[in-house]
Regions:
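Active-site/acyl-donor-binding loops of N-acyltransferases
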Residues: 137-174
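Conserved acetyl-CoA-binding loop-helix of GNAT-fold acetyltransferases
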Residues: 119-133
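Generic hydrophobic alpha-helical scaffold/packing signal
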Residues: 19, 98-99, 132, 157, ...
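A conserved beta-strand-loop-helix scaffold within acyl/acetyltransferase catalytic domains
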Residues: 1-119, 150
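Alpha-helical elements of Rossmann-like donor-binding domains used by nucleotide-donor carbohydrate transfer enzymes
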Residues: 14-17, 126-130, 155
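Membrane-targeting and insertion segments and their boundary/processing signals
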Residues: 102-105, 130, 134
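Alpha-helix boundary/interfacial micro-motifs
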Residues: 49-51, 122, 156, 163-164
Length: 174
């Protein structure tokens, strides 16, 4: 996110202090992937679907088309994983993360980011969803996802709009 948005984040000590200061009210969610394991799972899933397609024969053309689309999606993932320039694909790689601070009935997602190498994986959606679920379990009624850039072509707006947000504009913002 730093490189993509041309911003500079704070150092590790700052984030450790933030998490220590807010204790149980600080939520840190991180998504990981083991690329080597993911590739094996993709190949296994692809083989299972291909077996299912073969078993269908000429019947159920709609189901066959759906299964073929799944195979195509899996093949794209395999190409993505194979193209990654990662030293050790057997180690877990961070895909995305978010830090949320809960206070009373409100919570604020104050930092979030993703590894650009895995931009085609929807991991950030799960991180945000899990963060919001946990906040709700803590009694939070409203979670702020932070701002948007005020441009309808902004990818951040596209991402956040998938959570059915209530966009609040304050005087003097735009």
């Amino acid at each position: 996110t730093e490189k993509r948005k041309n911003i500079s984040l704070r150092g590790r000590e700052y984030f450790e202090n933030l998490l220590d200061t807010f204790g149980d009210n600080a939520l840190l969610y991180i998504s990981y992937i083991n690329v080597e394991k993911a590739v094996k799972e993709c190949h296994s899933r692809k083989e299972a679907i291909e077996d299912e397609i073969e078993a269908l024969g000429e019947k159920s053309p709609k189901k066959k088309r759906t299964l073929l689309e799944q195979v195509a999606g899996i093949e794209k993932l395999i190409v993505l994983f194979d193209s990654l320039e990662i030293e050790d694909k057997s180690k877990n790689q961070v895909i995305s993360a978010a830090i949320t601070i809960a206070y009373g009935k409100h919570a604020e997602i104050i930092y979030a980011g993703m590894n650009e190498d895995f931009a085609k994986l929807p991991a950030q959606y799960k991180v945000f969803s899990d963060t919001m679920k946990k906040a709700q379990e803590m009694g939070v009624k409203e979670v702020s996802m932070g701002g948007i850039e005020g441009d309808l072509n902004d990818s951040l707006l596209g991402f956040k709009s998938k959570f059915a947000p209530n966009i609040v504009e304050y005087y003097g913002e735009f």
